[in-house]
């Protein structure tokens, strides 16, 4: 269903998603955000941070992609996948809030994760970048800390033909005055 709502699979840019985020009243988030980008190793980094922060006593939300078996794997709270009913409620709320704004599959999922984290009252949300960083949907919220795991030639049609261009796109998740690794 979500795949039919947008004419393109990838549509880099943040304004459409920001409008829906505001309509959902999810800005600013009530939790700390850590954004993880890079070419390879993002999922492993998210899993490590998630485990470490939970061991320290934090309530943690983690958003990753793609999923392996079930969509619900993408959104976890304290390492438990959100259930179908919660996802359906959230998707319906996003669909109503978007009005005539088209959202990609990934943008829908990102908004669903942010909504679920808000609803669950997480302390920290770890968001994995889907593509690039600067114009990726997870970049609609300002991260308190951002990590770029690696930079290699990937998605050159979207991010640029060399490591410098790709690095620039991935570095777009950093915020002035906030820790970056």
Task: Show which residues each predicted segment covers.
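Internal gly/pro-rich beta-alpha loop/helix module
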Residues: 144, 158-181
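ATP-dependent carboxylate-amine ligase catalytic core
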Residues: 8-10, 14-31, 55-141, 153, ...
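A conserved segment at the C-terminal end of the G1
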Residues: 36, 44-61
């Amino acid at each position: 269903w979500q795949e039919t709502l947008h004419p393109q699979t990838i549509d880099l840019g943040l304004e459409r998603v920001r409008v829906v985020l505001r309509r959902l009243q999810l800005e600013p988030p009530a939790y700390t955000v850590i954004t993880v980008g890079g070419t390879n190793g993002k999922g492993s980094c998210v899993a490590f941070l998630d485990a470490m922060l939970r061991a320290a006593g934090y309530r943690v939300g983690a958003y990753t992609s793609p999923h392996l078996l079930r969509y619900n794997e993408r959104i976890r709270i304290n390492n438990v996948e959100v259930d179908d009913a919660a996802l359906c409620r959230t998707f319906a709320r996003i669909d109503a809030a978007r009005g005539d704004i088209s959202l990609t599959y990934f943008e829908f999922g990102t908004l669903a994760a942010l909504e679920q984290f808000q609803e669950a009252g997480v302390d920290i949300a770890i968001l994995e970048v889907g593509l690039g960083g600067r114009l990726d949907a997870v970049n609609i919220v300002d991260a308190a800390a951002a990590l770029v795991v690696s930079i290699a030639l990937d998605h050159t049609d979207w991010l640029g033909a060399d490591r410098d261009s790709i690095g620039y796109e991935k570095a777009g998740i950093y915020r002035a005055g906030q820790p970056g690794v």
